[in-house]
Amino acid sequence: MALPLSLATPALASEASADTPKDLDKVEVRGRAQTLYRANDAAVGTRTDTPLELVPQSIQVVPRELIDDQAARQVTDLYRSISGISFFSYAGVTLRGFRQENVLYDGLRGDPYAGFSVPQLFNIERVEVLKGPAGALYGGGDAGGVINYVTRKPKARAERRIELQAGDKDFRAGSIEGTGPLNASGSIRYRAGLYADSEQGVRWNADSESVIGDASLAFDVGQTGELVLQFTDITQNLGGNRLRGVPVNDAGSFLTDRRWNHNEASDFLDMRAKVALAQYRFAPRDNLDVDLAARWFSNNEHQMYHEPMGLIDRDRDGVAEWMTRQLRNQIRDNTAFAASGNAVWRINTGRIEHKVLFGADVYQLDADFTAQTANSADLARGAGPVRGIDLFNPVYGASTWHDYNLAALPWRSTATRSKRYGGYLQDELALGARWHVLAGLRWDGFKDQDRMGGGSVDGNDLSWRLGSTFTVRDGVNLYANIASGFVPQSATSQNPAAGGPFDAERSRQWEVGLKSLLADRVTLNMAAYRIDRSNIVQATGEVIGGVNQLAALGLVRSTGMELDLLADVTERWVVNLTYAYNDARVKDAGPNGITNASGDRFANAPRNKLGVWTRYDLPSINSAIGFGADHVGERVSLDGQTVKAYTVFDMSWKTTWKQWQFQANVKNLFDKVYAASGFIERNGHFPGEPRRVYVQAAYRF
């Protein structure tokens, strides 16, 4: 479903294009004059410049304007504006009923934030979401969809901006960024930015510090070419982390204060990532466009935290009040390289117009994991046991990881190499003014190696999709698609100690929908779908030898519908509404599945989700006010505990004075106590943020 939300961003999956710098700026200005949140195209669905209304697949684009209006610092702040997506844990989401963490950056695989840090938005121009099958184009594609982060690139027009932010919980942030030409002709352009923030967390003992540095250069090459080079450095230090949830009863009510933390103040999660990107686009002929891209990143994450292992009734009063704990010292080192090459050839065969895409990509990830575990009853270390923590009256600091003689503990390690590679062919056919057909085929290969034990798992398969769009009348388009999917299991899930190896995941989806633009003021998009996925690996919640156990569900079926509405109610008033209904259920647990899971709902998949964001401009005082609401229906956790429905509200005020812009945002306006998602019983539910207040001032020069 294609809800255009962008500030007229360029068509390609990256901000750069083969157009001249002057043309780039013209496109942006024209889009801002038309509407605040609408995009007309985004190549993430086809890797071509096909208009969104002609793509037989659901696509949503969240632009920078919407990110700024909502004072969104990380991607979790944007879920209300994307139908069918909700929070699962950390960077993971539920998309069309399924948990998924696979993301793209500028159309290439690899997440520098790994699995336990949440992607930040400082250097992100827009967020693109493909709903439904993406494997036939990107490989390794989850059937629910894929998220693509488009990073900011150099512009031809000089812009400089300084911003300061403050808020409750001692939140402080500042950034400086600039972009523009480096020479008189504008053939060399730059962008540089630096962002830093810090705050005391909403959970006891928790705090955070982040620093992001980003620099890029763009060079005109010949008459049609553009080369972009980019480097990003990310540092994130989280105190009192890794965070788990807060224990609940089976009805989903928190058993204690939502601020409760199982970690000590000395616990931490420190992450450092570096990313390098090179993109080159050119047009050797009028009907042929070529783009090449390569991306490298490294990620180092060190976690030292107390894992909650379950409540016991220590004082025998009939109430389980003591959370037993385990100390985990974990180090993850990831290094990855991704590359892709694409060519788009426009030809005619008789009266039929073809837009033929052919390309290939490759991805390699080296993942090293080293860990120690200290248990409560483990006295061989010659040090005190790992103390638990009281649920109702926690006393922090009675012991820390310094007291556990970790030097006496053995290390366990894994080292894997995951390779993904594929080639694809796609044809978009215009069979006249009203009828368009899209057909795509992709071959995928993979190889996962145990670099310590020497074992390996490899395989290959074909994925395909077929879709069609029919224009009923100007501004009203009907579409349908069917697609198959093939996703290799991650290298870590092949570990025999965790229950592996497992066969590759397979999927198939059927989708129909409507895309419409009414009176040039109202965009209404609807979709209905059914997705069958088999052999989905999930955590069972069981720990054997310090290793989290996995199991494969035989078949899960997700059915649902989505509605996206973007309306320019007046010249001053914009309304963005998203609604999704989903029913994801386990149909067959399979021979090695979770016991008695057949027929149960899939974890953290709400049946109903509604998001609203509206903005009203007050031109007489150069201001705008915004109001948002986010409703997520009842869900179940991984262990079947209820996760209650919730509704939260936000407000914002933005005003400009000369070159200054001032903004205030209130999130969770009525301080609703709620669970954002559920996990396993001993970990509890992840509490949603309490009311937060942010103010900021920005100066452009």
Question: Model segments located where?
Answer:
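Gram-negative outer-membrane beta-barrel transporters
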Residues: 433-434, 530-532, 551-639, 673, ...
